[in-house]
């Protein structure tokens, strides 16, 4: 097993797929997105890395896809189970695509949503509404312990509000207004958000590969 780590015992029985995240918001969101997409895979069959006691690898990739693969490879090796990971972020046009892969730690401390939002809005304080274009991007990766890998990508294009609005979601959801709507992602219901989100797109595209892996239809890599 890669890195000489012992395989995690994990929760008993029904676990068939592990998600490479310690963010419970993401675990719930990804369970909802995959619900019904994989025959025989219920919520109890999907657990997050934190529930297995897995540590987070260093994300030193240069793209969302590279970081998603880093996380999925590490968790597949640790757990001995198929692993799914995503790497996502906000890409702002006038910032040349930043924060991008640094979205979660834009203000310096990883996962400080309030600080990240405050810094971003301060940086855009003098930017007119017509120049506040942005998009969420998500790369979703599936990796099996025997080396099979598959990556899909999704995008949600919109513009940035002047101030945060809404109480749903997480991250930059309170400031991204999807094209064709007047509400921020944080003002959408979870169902509405998952139907259009970058993460929803990427994981729905990944679902057929997950089905194939869990049903034994994907041959071992190499």
Listing of model-derived features with the role each one plays in the protein:
Residues 2-18, 24-222:
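Anionic-ligand binding patches
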